[in-house]
Curated annotation (Swiss-Prot):
GO annotation, biological process: 'de novo' cotranslational protein folding; cell division; chaperone-mediated protein folding; protein transport; protein unfolding
Name assigned to this protein: Trigger factor
Reactions this protein catalyses: [protein]-peptidylproline (omega=180) = [protein]-peptidylproline (omega=0)
PANTHER family: TRIGGER FACTOR CHAPERONE AND PEPTIDYL-PROLYL CIS/TRANS ISOMERASE, TRIGGER FACTOR-LIKE PROTEIN TIG, CHLOROPLASTIC
One MF term in the entry's GO annotations: ribosome binding
UniProt function note: Involved in protein export. Acts as a chaperone by maintaining the newly synthesized protein in an open conformation. Functions as a peptidyl-prolyl cis-trans isomerase.
Domain PPIase FKBP-type: 174-261
Keyword Cell cycle attached: yes
Upper classification of the organism: Bacteria, Bacillati, Cyanobacteriota, Cyanophyceae, Synechococcales
Domain notes: Consists of 3 domains; the N-terminus binds the ribosome, the middle domain has PPIase activity, while the C-terminus has intrinsic chaperone activity on its own.
Region (Disordered): 437-473
Top-level taxon of origin: Bacteria
Alphabetical UniProt keywords: Cell cycle, Cell division, Chaperone, Cytoplasm, Isomerase, Rotamase
Gene3D superfamilies tied to this protein: 3.10.50.40, Trigger factor ribosome-binding domain, Trigger factor, C-terminal domain
């Protein structure tokens, strides 16, 4: 007797999805049903029968044919799916989706007949670049601002400041206020989630808290109470509060100020372990210039990556975006865990949902860029040789030998490969593209001119109906 084989038909769908129609012969279905019954029989306990010796009909009557079929059907789908993707050399990006649903399939399941299953899954998209050479981008030409050195020194002074109590004067910007407050929504009188504290140290700086909160405390004296009528910004992080009016009852419990150290050689020794203030300034300038140059380089790379992404011709499947979103959330959770936070209590379903929504646009951008770089690698045959990977891996030898954790060498090699390939691709982009630096003044001038032109057109559009009315009269 010739054993019947699984029949697979595939159809390409939009958004890099593929449909698979499977025809599973009745012999396979009967075999799985029989195997399921035997498996349950070996472990089922029914009074009056020895373990493993329960008659088939008794078992079916006791457990129910529907439950037996459901168990067998799950195994049939799983095995047939794995066999089908191997036969067709398909690399799925997502779990298979049963088009007709499991319940519908179970309702019509008959092991005496050929079983037809319709499945869909996401697959890697076909990549093509409309253009790779001769890309042109514009970036704003910026100069290093020497004022940033003074700002860095001032920041360091603030960090090393002594905190002293304020006596006989009202609060002012720059102070540290110890406040208690309670907030409610003006319309519903409902308490604001996270909008209260019995004691909180608040640096009185603009843009801290919601608009008007810090400004409302400025001028208060210790033991003063004040009612603040404020409004949450329309783009506030907490969705429930956006655009709502609120009432805060605030009490100033204590007031402190910072006593800043003098800028001298002693400060240089304390702040940066340098012998003199002059030496400290030089060191800060060097670091800031390096950071500035790196930032400018990254701006250029970002612009080139965006330009290349726009040239990508591909239907990106939803599964790819979902995977990127999930990876981002997992990385965030790992960072929180390293800080000692309880992940289980912190990462509630609501927070995970919020993070998924907020990180999705960036995830889409990341996937688009990565696919564009992959397409460039394929079209220009840009690769990384084994000797390059091995050379780079030597840099990690010392770190690997000292590490107390088990390091996955193969995974590290993959990371090194991806990093080296990305470096090569970006270098190729820089060499084969045009980057034009435009003055910040030109950008502002162009923006003003566009705004004026838009305002003029809007004004003309508004006056046009009035002109027509006069003509009719």
């Amino acid at each position: 007797m010739i054993k019947e084989a699984l029949i697979v038909k595939t159809t390409a769908l939009p958004q890099s999805r593929i449909a698979l129609e499977l025809e599973i012969p009745s012999n396979t279905c009967k075999s799985f049903v029989s195997e399921t019954i035997n498996s349950i029989s070996r472990s089922a306990k029914i009074p009056g029968f020895r373990l493993g010796k329960i008659p088939k009909q008794v078992l079916i009557q006791r457990i129910g044919i529907n439950q037996l079929y459901a168990s067998a059907l799950e195994k049939i789908i799983d095995k047939s799916w794995k066999e089908a993707i191997e036969m067709e050399s398909i690399e799925p990006l997502s779990e298979p989706e049963l088009v007709d649903g499991f319940e519908s399939l179970l309702k019509n399941f008959n092991p005496e007949k050929t079983l037809k299953i319709n499945l869909q899954t996401d697959v890697a998209p076909t990549l093509k670049l409309k253009k790779s050479k001769g890309l042109s981008v514009e970036i704003i030409k910026r100069k290093f601002d020497p004022k940033s050195i003074d700002e860095a020194l001032e920041k360091s002074r603030n960090q090393l400041a002594n905190i002293i109590p304020v006596i006989n004067r009202p609060a002012r910007l720059g102070d540290i206020a110890v406040v208690s407050f309670k907030g409610i929504y003006k319309d519903s009188k409902k308490a604001i989630d996270g909008g209260s504290s019995d004691s909180m140290d608040l640096e009185l700086e603009k843009n801290k808290m919601i608009p008007g909160f810090v400004e409302g405390i400025v001028g208060m004296k210790i033991d003063d109470n004040k009612t603040l009528n404020l409004k949450f910004p329309d783009d506030y992080s907490h969705e429930e509060s956006r655009g709502k009016e609120a009432i805060f009852e605030v009490s100033l419990k204590d007031l402190k100020e910072k006593e800043l150290p003098e800028l001298n050689d002693d400060f240089a020794k304390q702040s940066g372990n340098k012998d003199s203030l002059k030496e400290l300034k030089k060191d800060i300038e060097k670091q800031l210039k390096e950071n500035f140059d790196n930032t400018q380089k990254n701006i250029k790379i970002e612009a080139l990556m965006d330009a290349l992404s726009k040239e990508l011709d591909a239907e990106i499947p939803k599964a790819m975006i979902d995977i990127e979103v999930r990876n981002n959330i997992e990385q965030t959770a790992q960072r929180f865990a390293q800080q000692g936070m309880d992940i289980k209590s912190t990462f509630t379903p609501e927070l995970v949902k919020t993070l998924a929504e907020s990180t999705r646009p960036q995830a889409e951008k990341n996937v688009q860029r990565n696919l564009a770089l992959k397409a460039l690698s394929e079209s220009e045959n840009i690769t990384v040789e084994d000797k390059e990977i091995n050379q780079k891996m030597k840099e990690y030898d010392d770190e690997i030998s000292k590490s107390q954790k088990q390091i996955d060498i193969q995974k590290l090699k993959e990371v090194v490969l991806n990093d080296l390939l990305k470096e090569k691709l970006i270098t190729w982009l820089e060499e084969n593209s045009t980057v034009k630096e435009i003055s910040e003044k030109v950008t502002k001038s162009t923006t003003k001119s566009k705004t004026k032109s838009k305002t003029k057109k809007e004004s003309q559009a508004k006056s046009e109906p009035n002109k027509k009315k006069k003509e009719k009269k």
